[in-house]
Amino acid sequence: MSFRLQPPPPARPNRCQLFGPGSRPALFEKMAASAADVVNLDLEDSVAPDDKAQARLNIIEAINTLDWGKKYLSVRINGLDTPFWYRDVVDLLEQAGDRLDQIMIPKVGCAADVYAVDALVTAIERAKGRTKPVSFEVIIESAAGIAHVEEIAAASPRLQAMSLGAADFAASMGMQTTGIGGTQENYYMLHEGQKHWSDPWHWAQAAIVAACRTHGILPVDGPFGDFSDDEGFRAQARRSATLGMVGKWAIHPKQVALANEVFTPSDKAVAEAREILAAMEAAKARGEGATVYKGRLVDIASIKQAEVIVRQAEMISA
């Protein structure tokens, strides 16, 4: 074991983050009643510049008046390269009550970006006497962001989650695609006349997972733009879950059930994990460090793998 300990991530479900524009308050009650673990009320890309101020008012009113149940309630502010973000933070922290759980910071390119928001939030919390600290989620959406992903992950104790914003990331990287997540038409190798598709987002997602797991942060898969393609959404979500991500964005209500389905361990997976733990307990009682389970070797590392699945299932059911 390394001298550097890997802290656990926040113990809360984050299977689905449902997004809705702050300029469409008619959607808020439906979002509050949804099955999403996290609701992201948006002030950024889905809101036109002339609508920013009203969207901010809409969100503050909704935070203070609607019943959000057990939802983890997050607001995506505008980017630090805009004239809107500071007013987003000030008004949210001064006017929205303690029901606000999280601020999502878009287009983060370095640790200083997180520090800037943290400093402002901390000052307002102290001035207003807020007793519940607001957490952060950041979105990696640029070449600079992925290049500095680990320093970003270590930037603030408020940081609880990190996502990849595929569209802006693709533009920053100069990628020849207009898709938002998913398989890209020309990203394949040709062998004996057959196309072998690959995943252009995999390397960036893997970097995010590694940085998040190192620093005790929840790694979350970003958007899948084609909300008419359920199987495409499931495929990308399964890949992300296998990679170590805990959930995925939903940009349409129909994607909520899909995300919850994929990121909830199946009964079969949980039963198998419990059987592996039981098999290893029996092996330990015999003085053995490994045993055979259904024809394959399991050992001490298998205990850790099985515990991941069991803990996730227990947290969701609770």
From Swiss-Prot:
Annotated binding of Mg(2+), by residue: E141, D168
UniProt-listed Pfam families: HpcH_HpaI
Disulfide bonding pattern of the chain: none
Entry EC no(s): 4.1.3.24
UniProt keyword annotations, A-Z: Lyase, Magnesium, Manganese, Metal-binding
Annotated cofactor note: Divalent cations such as magnesium or manganese.
Keyword Magnesium: yes
Reactions the enzyme catalyzes: (S)-malyl-CoA = glyoxylate + acetyl-CoA; (2R,3S)-beta-methylmalyl-CoA = propanoyl-CoA + glyoxylate
Signal sequence residues: none
Annotated GO MF terms: L-erythro-3-methylmalyl-CoA lyase activity; magnesium ion binding; malyl-CoA lyase activity; metal ion binding
Reported cofactor(s): Mg(2+); Mn(2+)
Residues annotated for substrate binding in this entry: F19, R24, K30, R76, A167, D168, I251, H252
An individual GO BP term: oxaloacetate metabolic process
PANTHER family: CITRATE LYASE SUBUNIT BETA, LYASE BETA SUBUNIT, PUTATIVE (AFU_ORTHOLOGUE AFUA_4G13030)-RELATED
Known function: Involved in the ethylmalonyl-CoA pathway for acetate assimilation. Catalyzes the reversible condensation of glyoxylate and acetyl-CoA to L-malyl-CoA and the reversible condensation of glyoxylate and propionyl-CoA to yield beta-methylmalyl-CoA.
Family: Belongs to the HpcH/HpaI aldolase family.
Protein's name in the database: L-malyl-CoA/beta-methylmalyl-CoA lyase
Source organism per UniProt: Cereibacter sphaeroides (strain ATCC 17025 / ATH 2.4.3) (Rhodobacter sphaeroides)
Lineage, broadest ranks: Bacteria, Pseudomonadati, Pseudomonadota, Alphaproteobacteria, Rhodobacterales
Recorded name of the encoding gene: mcl1
